[in-house]
């Protein structure tokens, strides 16, 4: 597969060995990149995870058939329209999109439920960086990452869960050190 996404995702996916082309936010450059993928890299179909109208427009004008959720009025631009699943975790939501796209394209999904391990491969430098950070900040082996970083509204409700601080005490009581990445808001 070839991946297209925000620049930060490139390093996250580096261990998978897949082609990655960044979307920079410069429409003409991004469109040129998508058209190149369509014409020269065998990218005939695109699975759109983000909910943005912009990604659907980019793939439509880039001449790549796309499958994705019918959010944000994207249904007119999608080749394969996938209805929003019932309320679920984002991992399950994105799995639903991929699962339904594979079926719509005539394939058979490898799993019908989200596997316990997503199979994301890390590079040695990722493992070394994590080890260095854990040593630098004295992070114990048992920890939980709390990252209340979502911003904005989804269906009229704040996307950032307001009770992250309430988790700190109970986690520590069972021997798990919370590592909190604060929200900038």
What is each stretch, according to the model?
Residues 1-185:
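Catalytic machinery of carbohydrate-active enzymes
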């Amino acid at each position: 597969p070839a991946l297209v996404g925000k620049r930060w995702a490139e390093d996250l996916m580096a261990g998978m060995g897949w082609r990655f082309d960044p979307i920079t936010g410069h429409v003409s450059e991004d469109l040129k990149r998508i058209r190149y993928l369509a014409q020269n890299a065998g990218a005939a179909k695109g699975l759109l995870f983000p909910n943005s109208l912009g990604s659907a427009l980019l793939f439509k004008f880039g001449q790549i058939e796309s499958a994705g959720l019918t959010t944000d009025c994207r249904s007119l631009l999608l080749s394969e329209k996938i209805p929003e699943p019932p309320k679920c975790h984002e991992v399950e939501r994105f799995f639903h999109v991929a699962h339904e796209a594979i079926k719509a394209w005539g394939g058979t999904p490898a799993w019908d439920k989200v596997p316990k391990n997503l199979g994301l491969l890390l590079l040695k430098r990722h493992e070394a960086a994590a080890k260095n950070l854990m040593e630098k900040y004295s992070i114990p082996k048992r920890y939980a990452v709390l990252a209340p970083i979502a911003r904005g509204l989804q269906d009229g409700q704040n996307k950032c869960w307001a009770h992250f601080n309430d988790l700190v005490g109970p986690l520590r009581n069972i021997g798990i050190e919370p590592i909190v990445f604060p929200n900038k808001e």
